[in-house]
From Swiss-Prot:
FMN binds at residues 53-58, 68-69, 75, 97, 132-133, 177, 187. It comes from Rhizobium leguminosarum bv. trifolii (strain WSM2304). Pathway: Cofactor metabolism; pyridoxal 5'-phosphate salvage; pyridoxal 5'-phosphate from pyridoxamine 5'-phosphate: step 1/1; Cofactor metabolism; pyridoxal 5'-phosphate salvage; pyridoxal 5'-phosphate from pyridoxine 5'-phosphate: step 1/1. Its EC number is 1.4.3.5. The keyword Oxidoreductase applies. This is Pyridoxine/pyridoxamine 5'-phosphate oxidase. Belongs to the pyridoxamine 5'-phosphate oxidase family. The lineage of its organism: Bacteria, Pseudomonadati, Pseudomonadota, Alphaproteobacteria, Hyphomicrobiales. Substrate binds at residues 58, 115, 119, 123, 183-185. PANTHER family: PYRIDOXINE-5'-PHOSPHATE OXIDASE, PYRIDOXINE-5-PHOSPHATE OXIDASE.
Length: 206
């Protein structure tokens, strides 16, 4: 899909950010060659220093944006400590960007269990074997742990580790950006003071 084949109409007239995001993500799924749901996730440590990494968005609705991770990882620890995070999607083929930020909540056990069961068996084993974000002696040590958990769960279902679950960012700000000539880009931001509040929309200078 080219930039000339996108949703008709002026996106800056939209009044519903989740609907607009769904439209943009759908067009990215038709245009981006790899992982259109990839998103930069920013967190802050206890000293106020930011960290950012790519994760995969695994769901969204009017309640927020969901991804899954090891809660003992750097991002897991920082989110549990600060209870806030930010995301940035950039779809290069469409020359579009979406930024959002807000408080974070943990998904329900039922949600986490349901998603965990959809993962490839090797990925479920990996959730047990990987001590994410901690020093690793060698590749062999990781492969040994994978072999041990593969043997342990050779028969039957692989349970979800207690330290592996999902987070939901409940945005209080969502910004949509579209590239235009001469850096005179189109940019709108939806804001609300609380995740349960009504949205206000502001058009921003590029």
């Amino acid at each position: 899909m080219s930039a000339n084949e996108l949703t008709s109409g002026d996106f800056t007239e939209s009044g519903e950010p989740f609907k607009l995001f769904a439209e943009w993500l759908g067009e990215a799924e038709a245009s981006e060659p790899n992982d259109p749901n990839a998103v930069a996730l920013a967190t802050v440590d206890e000293d106020g220093l930011p960290n950012v990494r790519m994760v995969l968005l695994k769901g969204f609705d009017d309640n927020g944006f969901v991804f899954y991770t090891n809660f003992e990882s750097q991002k897991g620890r920082e989110i549990l400590g600060q209870k806030k995070a930010a995301m940035c999607f950039h779809w290069k083929s469409l020359r579009r960007q979406v930024r959002l930020r807000g408080p974070v909540e943990i998904v329900t056990d039922a949600e986490a269990d349901a998603y965990f069961k959809t993962r490839a068996r090797g990925s479920r084993i990996g959730a047990w074997a990987s001590k994410q974000s901690r020093p690793l002696e060698s590749r062999f040590a990781l492969e040994k742990a994978v072999a041990e958990y593969t043997a342990r769960y050779a028969i039957g279902e692989i349970p979800r580790p207690a330290h592996w679950s999902g987070f939901r960012i409940r945005p209080t700000s969502i910004e949509f950006w579209k590239d235009q000539n001469f850096r005179l880009h189109d940019r709108i931001e939806f804001r609300r003071p609380l995740p349960e509040g009504a949205w206000d929309k502001v058009r921003m200078y590029p």
